[in-house]
């Protein structure tokens, strides 16, 4: 399963949201993510992809779409 597919599956499991058609939509503005959801997502991303997401790098504007989240995971895997 690709990173993109896994991230989409995480959103479905954690938030019961199908974000597959919302790849570039702001997930905060759409009501999919909030502060608590962000923490849940970070924990799941770290566990699923065996990465460490520095809170200082998890800016709302940098991780607000599925596409940006996938790119962030890819960058952290290659860091």
UniProtKB/Swiss-Prot annotation:
Keyword set includes Magnesium: no
The Carrier domain, residue ranges: 1-77
Pathway: Cell wall biogenesis; lipoteichoic acid biosynthesis
Primary location group: cytoplasm
Entry's transmembrane regions: none
Keyword terms, alphabetized: Cell wall biogenesis/degradation, Cytoplasm, Phosphopantetheine, Phosphoprotein
A GO term from the CC aspect: cytoplasm
Pfam families: PP-binding
GO molecular function, one term: D-alanyl carrier activity
Function of the protein: Carrier protein involved in the D-alanylation of lipoteichoic acid (LTA). The loading of thioester-linked D-alanine onto DltC is catalyzed by D-alanine--D-alanyl carrier protein ligase DltA. The DltC-carried D-alanyl group is further transferred to cell membrane phosphatidylglycerol (PG) by forming an ester bond, probably catalyzed by DltD. D-alanylation of LTA plays an important role in modulating the properties of the cell wall in Gram-positive bacteria, influencing the net charge of the cell wall.
HAMAP family: DltC (MF_00565)
Protein name (database record): D-alanyl carrier protein
Lineage: Bacteria, Bacillati, Bacillota, Bacilli, Lactobacillales
């Amino acid at each position: 399963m690709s990173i993109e597919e896994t991230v989409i599956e995480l959103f479905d499991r954690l938030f019961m949201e199908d974000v597959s058609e919302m790849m570039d939509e702001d997930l905060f503005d759409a009501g999919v993510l909030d502060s608590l959801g962000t923490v849940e997502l970070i924990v799941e991303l770290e566990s699923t992809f065996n990465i460490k997401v520095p809170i200082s790098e998890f800016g709302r504007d940098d991780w607000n779409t599925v596409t940006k989240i996938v790119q962030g995971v890819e960058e952290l895997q290659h860091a």
